[in-house]
Swiss-Prot record:
InterPro entries: NSL1 (IPR026180), PEHE_dom (IPR029332). Expressed in the brain. Changing residue 921 to R: Abolishes interaction with KAT8. This is KAT8 regulatory NSL complex subunit 1. The gene is KANSL1.
Length: 1105
């Protein structure tokens, strides 16, 4: 097969259609003789047909399927680079003839594009490739099996050609133009030339070597007429075009017989090696490139198909749904006529039509029957299933948010790829695209605009409603019907009493129309003077003050003899103005001189008590705006409700809460970007108030009424209440219990109370904190005898001091100045306000409010039980001692040592059954039952009795009581900070007796401090033995397990203690003033078992009943 010229990337299509002119053996080849040679050229096309061309007539003429006249002048420098030096340049418009020798080394080294000749497929060729051979060349090619004949010299190289043809290695091939047999660059690269869209020729050979037979299968060239054949068929590379279908038939003008020409030969080992070295890499690269192109094209087609499919599915579903709605809602009226009207009317009409269509039961196709029916038609179910499947398939195939993003809606692509310019944007999720943001912003604007339009239309409706109401009120108002002008004779009578009522307004110098014009005709000088002054202003309008014409002014100075300077100045002023007096026809008459015929009583409308006109539930605004001039609004009814303290609703939306803090932020129309940054900073700065639990605020350690410097008492009552609220917030851990407990306030309301304190009180807050933590009190001799109290008892004393001990007798008994700030503050919260100084005088109503609020705020605390004075005024409250029982702690015990002890086998096992515990508690239960039965059998006494006081269930007369009106306990000495809960409070008859009362003999001794008998005489059932106090020792430590049972030690003392208890009750009962009312005997008091291991004397604990 003849080799072709190398492929040129910048050449036209003619560069691949090269004519090879072979000279006869007997002539010497030169450029001139080659041109004038009259031998015909044979054109062999790819389809194997033989054509005849006359080169002498038209060198550029060739008979192809699409013969065209082409200009080859531009190919001279490109082709000349591959020719030898003895070849002249090719003239224009002539067929290219191979006139030199191409060496494979020069071609391969000088042109690196030979391996890329596959790229020039359809771009360079528009028709099938054509090879030209001379008849002499074909004749020599036919002698393949014979020995090489001596060839004619071609370009003076016949000797070299003869030598090369005599070699045994080259017997099967014929060398032309004296050159070595070159190798083909890429012989169509594995058969891909025939499969390209344009059927171009992909490669050429660098020398004029024609093998008689095809080479190796993978190194031969395939010519195929079918342009759409298989592109990678490597097994069909054996030259079917030149062996079978490309056989040359006898020419019409040829003298030699070319029929049955077959290109046969043997394989060349050298060409196989060279083919395999260059062709393998280029073929693989071309295949990969071709595959990538096909894949990209298929991807684009698939995307277009998905878009078309999604649009078709959408159009189909919209069409089906539209038909379904048209069929279902066919009974709806036409609303097009209502569109020019207001939107409100259109909405109402549409809603009414929908309700009517939904309630229709006449037709089976109505919406109500469709919605109420349990079954759906088969066709509708089928459409629903298919529509859902199609939509889901389209979404999964087309939506990038489903295919390319993770489950959280975020893409897994790195940030560098996200910022890369990609017009397709397959990796960017929908929420990150600008279209999504634009749609979200547009939806926000549309929603706010719709809300604004709805509210504007609602306001217009309200304005029309208010206008109608105003017109109705004016229509129903009615006019005042006056009588006719009275005759002049009646005017004279009327003037005399009216003359003294003529008054003026000093501020405006205007007179009131009270005298008619006919008065000027009378002859009295003073009357004429008055009428003259009145006629000048008879028809003038009076200036209203606050909407009311003021008629109650001082008497006119003109009536007084001896005119003042104001009256003279007023008279001269009127004369200068030359005011025209009213006409004397009597038409302009004062209204007060005419009789009233009819006057309809008008309704008085008060805006404060008007019912809201709107039917909507009004939500009170907690923040009063700065533009609120009128405190009462007739529309919303928010008159005096806004004066309440602001309470932020934390469950409300964010914009609504921000609108309460800043009036520039609208709760609906404002965008998130409109919120000032300062509001966000405030929420960050004040976050500790929301995050810090209120219970973590440490209570004050100690509170004593120590004398401090007096504070100015000029603060108002509200400031005192706020200060009291501030102090009570520090005492939140001290709790109060009331017989009518109310719900506790939340932590947020406590914060609001603290935040409601004015700035003056916030400045004084550190002072109050120093007041709550005072220095130790001055040493008192009685203070050393007191038992140490814990902090909870001190707080209970202070709180009870707040509520119950702030009366005048209590304040008089204290050793502190009455103008102490805390005492003055506590005195305002008393139920019986007795002021200690002029600065602490408040009313009873204002003093009771903080007490009620404080009782509502506190909750019941089981660790700090305080009984108010209103509940137990005549009893003594004693702190329970079982709180301070020392319990043993856990310790590690070696089990091996316990197992080895011999006493463990003889140790008695404790009985823990229910029967054993019931037997142990039987005595205590009987005693408790007897005590409660005795309490219910006591005869009832009047609670507010003046001559009797109930201390332990019995009545004792007050003989020398200093304050017999109210049963008050003794006023204690509060100079030292000991517990107020143990001063002089007896136990309530209804309250259960503490276990400690039965664990000791009833020795009547005083507990804490001396009674102030001078201030108040308290007669108790137990006498006071002395001023010294018996110290109370705690329980002694015990070692467990106990060596002896304490039951045997206490059985001996049981009878003696019962007898002592009976004697004590008889003695106390004999002190009553009434002999007829014999008090019932008390049940026997059985003490509990002693828990001490030491003598019984140390276990005796004195106590009061």
């Amino acid at each position: 097969m003849a080799a072709m010229a190398p492929a040129l990337t910048d050449a036209a299509a003619e560069a691949h259609h090269i004519r090879f002119k072979l000279a006869p053996p007997s002539s010497t080849l030169s450029p001139g003789s080659a041109e004038n040679n009259g031998n015909a050229n044979i054109l062999i096309a790819a389809n194997g047909t033989k054509r005849k061309a006359i080169a002498a007539e038209d060198p550029s003429l060739d008979f192809r399927n699409n013969p065209t006249k082409e200009d080859l002048g531009k190919l001279q420098p490109l082709v000349a680079s591959y020719l030898c030096s003895d070849v002249t340049s090719v003239p224009s418009k002539e067929s290219l003839k191979l006139q030199g020798v191409f060496s494979k080394q020069t071609v391969l080294k000088s042109h690196p594009l030979l391996s890329q000749s596959y790229e020039l497929r359809a771009e360079l060729l528009g028709r099938q490739p054509v090879l030209e051979f001379s008849l002499e060349n074909l004749r020599t090619m036919n002698t393949s099996g014979q020995t090489a004949l001596p060839q004619a010299p071609v370009n003076g190289l016949a000797k070299k050609l003869t030598k090369s043809s005599t070699h045994s290695d080259h017997d099967n091939s014929t060398s032309l133009n004296g050159g070595k047999r070159a190798l083909t660059s890429s012989a169509l690269h594995g058969g891909e030339m025939g499969g390209s869209e344009s059927g171009d020729l992909k490669g050429g050979m660098t020398n004029c070597t024609l093998p008689h037979r095809s080479l190796d299968v993978e190194h031969t060239t395939l010519y195929s007429n079918n342009s759409t054949a298989n592109k990678s068929s490597v097994n069909s590379m054996e030259q079917p075009a030149l062996q079978g279908s490309s056989r040359l038939s006898p020419g019409t003008d040829s003298s030699s017989n070319l029929g049955g020409v077959k290109l046969e030969g043997k394989k060349s080992p050298l060409s196989s090696i060279l083919f395999s070295a260059l062709d393998s890499d280029t073929r693989i690269t071309a295949l990969l490139r071709r595959q990538a192109d096909i894949e990209s094209r298929a991807r684009r087609l698939q995307k277009r198909l998905q878009v078309v499919q999604a649009k078709q599915v959408e159009r189909h579903i919209q069409h089906q749904l539209g038909g379904f709605l048209e069929k279902t809602l066919s009974k709806l009226p036409n609303l097009e006529s209502l569109r020019p009207r207001s939107q409100l009317m259109l909405t109402r009409k549409a809603e009414a039509a929908l309700r009517k269509a939904a309630s229709e039961t006449t037709t089976s196709e109505g919406l109500s029957n469709f919605l109420k029916s349990n079954s759906i038609s088969e066709e509708l179910e089928r459409f629903t299933a298919s529509g859902i499947a199609n939509l889901r398939c389209s979404e999964q195939a087309f939506d990038s948010d489903v295919t390319d993003s993770s489950s959280g809606g975020e893409s897994d692509i790195e940030e560098e790829e996200l910022t890369r310019a990609d017009p397709e944007q397959r990796h960017v999720p929908l929420r990150r695209r600008s279209e999504w943001k634009w749609a979200a912003d547009r939806a926000a604007i549309v929603s706010r605009w719709n809300w604004l339009q709805a509210h504007v239309s609602d306001l217009e409706y309200r304005i029309r409603q208010q206008t109608d109401i105003y017109k109705q009120i004016r229509a129903n108002k009615g006019l005042i019907v006056l009588g006719e002008v009275p005759p002049p004779e009646h005017t004279t009578d009327l003037f005399l009493p009216l003359s003294s009522e003529v008054k003026t307004d000093h501020g405006t110098d205007k007179l009131i129309e009270s005298v008619s014009q006919p008065l000027e005709n009378h002859g009295a000088p003073i009357i004429g003077h008055i009428s003259e002054s009145l006629s000048t202003k008879s028809c003038g309008a009076l200036r209203p003050v606050n909407g009311v014409i003021n008629t109650l002014q001082p008497v006119l100075a003109d009536h007084i003899p001896g005119d003042s300077s104001d009256a003279e100045e007023q008279l001269h002023k009127k004369q200068r103005l030359n005011l025209v007096s009213s006409s004397s026809d009597g038409t302009c008459v004062a209204a007060r001189t005419r009789p009233v015929l009819s006057c309809k009583k008008r309704r008085l409308v008060r805006p404060n008590s008007i019912v809201p006109l709107s039917k909507k539930v009004h939500r009170n605004s907690t923040i009063r705006p700065g533009c609120d001039v009128n405190p009462s609004c007739a529309l919303c009814g928010s008159g005096s409700i806004n004066t309440m303290p602001p309470e932020i609703h934390y469950e409300a939306p964010l914009l609504e809460r921000l609108s309460q803090l800043d009036s520039c932020v609208h709760p609906v129309l404002a965008f998130p970007d409109d919120v000032p940054t300062s509001l966000h900073f405030q929420s960050m700065l004040k976050s500790q108030w929301q995050n810090k639990p209120f219970d973590k605020i440490k209570p004050p350690k100690k509170l004593s009424l120590k004398h401090r410097a007096p504070m100015p008492g000029s603060l108002p009552d509200s400031a005192r209440k706020d200060r009291h609220k501030l102090v009570s917030s520090f005492l939140t851990t001290a709790k109060l219990s009331h017989h009518q407990t109310r719900p506790d306030r939340t932590h947020r309301q406590h914060l609001d109370d603290v935040g409601a304190v004015p700035m003056v009180e916030r400045v004084t807050a550190p002072k109050a904190e120093r007041l709550l933590n005072p220095p130790p009190p001055v040493h008192d001799p009685n203070h050393s005898k007191m038992r140490l109290r814990d902090h909870s008892s001190e707080r209970s004393e202070v709180l009870k001091h707040h509520t119950d001990m702030s009366s005048s007798s209590y304040l008089a008994a204290t050793h502190h100045p009455p103008h102490s700030p805390l005492v003055r503050q506590l005195s305002t919260s008393s139920d019986s306000p007795a002021p200690a100084s002029s600065s602490s005088q408040v009313t009873a109503s204002t003093s009771q409010q903080p007490v009620r609020r404080r009782r509502g705020e506190s909750s019941f605390d089981i660790n700090n039980i305080v009984i108010p004075m209103s509940v137990a005024a005549t009893t003594r409250v004693e702190k329970l001692q079982y709180k301070e029982i020392l319990t043993p702690s856990w310790r590690e015990v070696d089990l091996q040592s316990l197992k080895g002890s011999p006493d463990e086998e003889n140790e008695e096992i404790e009985d823990l059954s229910d029967a054993a515990f019931a037997a142990l508690h039987a005595k205590c239960e009987e005693m408790e039952r007897a005590r409660w039965l005795w309490t219910t059998s006591v005869p009832p006494q009047r609670r507010g009795s003046r001559s009797y006081r109930s201390s332990d269930g019995r009545t004792t007369p007050q003989l020398g009581s200093a304050n017999p009106s109210t049963p008050q306990p003794a006023s204690p000495d509060v100079s030292s900070s000991h517990s107020l809960s143990e001063y002089s409070h007896g136990q309530s008859p209804r309250s259960p007796i503490s276990p400690e009362l039965h664990s000791a003999p009833l020795t009547p001794v005083a507990r804490d401090t001396p009674r102030h008998l001078a201030s108040e005489d308290t007669r108790c059932s137990t006498p006071e033995l002395g001023l010294d106090e018996q110290s109370v020792q705690p329980w002694e430590r015990r070692t467990f397990p106990l060596a002896h049972s304490p039951q045997a030690e206490c059985e001996d003392q049981l009878d003696a203690q019962e007898r002592a208890a009976r004697c004590t009750r008889r003695t106390s009962g004999s002190k009553t003033g009434r002999e007829t009312e014999a008090a019932p005997t008390s049940p026997p008091i059985v003490p509990l078992k002693s828990r001490h291991l030491v003598a019984a004397a140390t276990a005796q604990r004195p106590t009061h009943r």
